[in-house]
């Protein structure tokens, strides 16, 4: 009976974590480049336990046009690299801008990293006359002068590296492996790959799982209490 309570409690924990992930996915439905997270329960029949593991859906989100020359979308594999106070982070969010001192930065002001380090375009800019072009391979040119190359990196372990809206940091640029199977599209952004209908369906199913597990815990706890009462007679 104690074992049954323990297993049901684990199911409650799994349902809670599932609901947290579903809520996060729905909250980021309109977040550029967001990759949905999910939890699945693998039933270990031999041990009679439920193991909860996290997963990241790295599938391509829909691409939409913005006509902003500083918006970039990656089709295929790979992530942009940005330099934060925590080190290098990787992201599919390509809504960039140019800072007052000429750096290409993300929406939080973090410098975008190229193959030669942080990308600074100051010396190539000529006010409103600056014609910024980015090739499919991430080569940045301004007024036909080559200025920098975006560092598009490869990440194999999405689950381990997931950290908030980006993927986790590393302090050493040499840890980064360059991706080759990608294409950069200028003037486009990638939508979140969250499907709201799927998430709502998951929410209903998880709610049912939680209710079932809660009823089982309540039943077993009541049965245990009755057994203890009989033992006192």
How does the language model describe each region?
Residues 1-233:
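Amphipathic alpha-helical polymerization modules
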